[in-house]
Amino acid sequence: MASLGPAAAGEQASGAEAEPGPAGPPPPPSPSSLGPLLPLQREPLYNWQATKASLKERFAFLFNSELLSDVRFVLGKGRGAAAAGGPQRIPAHRFVLAAGSAVFDAMFNGGMATTSAEIELPDVEPAAFLALLRFLYSDEVQIGPETVMTTLYTAKKYAVPALEAHCVEFLTKHLRADNAFMLLTQARLFDEPQLASLCLDTIDKSTMDAISAEGFTDIDIDTLCAVLERDTLSIRESRLFGAVVRWAEAECQRQQLPVTFGNKQKVLGKALSLIRFPLMTIEEFAAGPAQSGILSDREVVNLFLHFTVNPKPRVEYIDRPRCCLRGKECCINRFQQVESRWGYSGTSDRIRFTVNRRISIVGFGLYGSIHGPTDYQVNIQIIEYEKKQTLGQNDTGFSCDGTANTFRVMFKEPIEILPNVCYTACATLKGPDSHYGTKGLKKVVHETPAASKTVFFFFSSPGNNNGTSIEDGQIPEIIFYT
């Protein structure tokens, strides 16, 4: 089982400790410490109960002890057993186990109850089983980075949810970017949705660190696809593609396949379709995926056409941005009415704006054709007005249906907007005459129950701007996250 890393080394989680009592006779040596083949010895201990002041102390005294035991478990596989030189025998008490676990209750008292004095557990590691027994006898939790996974498995196997919860809490406490993929794999294996969700959140926030960790190439294909499907990864798509190629090379080795272009494509399967190649720049695509040998010649040509020609041909790959943002998408519209016939001659529609709080803009809503279904070419930009610095842009296109609705045009990555800084929203369209907005608002307030007000102020930009102003024109909507 993989370790949680250096930050967790040597740590253990401890629950309730046994209260000190009067000095009494020492407990008999446990058979697990005597070796696997020695005969059991029950040394009489007179009046040991008098030295234990509480029920908890009395049961804790019986933990891993032959005293009054009526069953033994033989554990013969795993690292713990190997280190001990062979099978280990661990004594226990049927009543205590049945009181703490429905699985043990069925084992000892159910319709097919066993009467055997020794029960073999070949799939359980001794250290994990002792951690389970310690918890059942004393409520004490004793887990560490090297045993937490096997203890979680054992707690689930014997239906002890309280110990499961302690294991998950321990894992959550030690969750970091460099072990997030390893823990995500285990969380999915053990059906721990809360831990899996926390792992995914960590991967979202620190994607580059997470995919650079050794554990990334060890994940299974289903976990890889679950991550690639996410809209919230904070990484450039070209770097994500490089990490996926590394995973494919490791998977070829696991399956004992030659590391060839064809085999990498084979092991990736559906995961390849989840890479969002349209989010790359043409330079990133040319330097990486186009030369990787993983894509077919037809796919490479189609993607190059997508990057270079207008109108852009449809491609098989997702072009939705990975927002790396939390919360709900928001949208404001600055116009109160829609009219017909707004023409385009190559001049950009522009409108300046400020906002009262930090937000991230992910796209615009634009008006489409008055002549029925049509495709438009469009370049969208956000420019910091004072510095004349372009913060983000996208050469893309959109299809409209001839209605007066707005149509979403998205940036490849979210653009951070700072409070009280002036920006210019810019859209350069190529296509037929469109609808346009009128009765524009200088101030638009967006309010949600979960967040404070987001207030936009709009100003006309100097110059022609294709006629767009505060009062009327294009760029009716701004799509953003708070």
UniProtKB/Swiss-Prot annotation:
Residues 1-36 are annotated as: Disordered. One of its GO terms (biological process) is muscle organ development. It comes from the Eukaryota. Residues 69-145 form the BTB domain. InterPro entries: BACK (IPR011705), BTB/POZ_dom (IPR000210), PHR (IPR012983), PHR_sf (IPR038648), SKP1/BTB/POZ_sf (IPR011333). One of its GO terms (molecular function) is identical protein binding. Pathway: Protein modification; protein ubiquitination. Interacts (via C-terminus) with TOP1. Interacts with TRIM5 isoform Delta. Interacts with CUL3. This is BTB/POZ domain-containing protein 1.
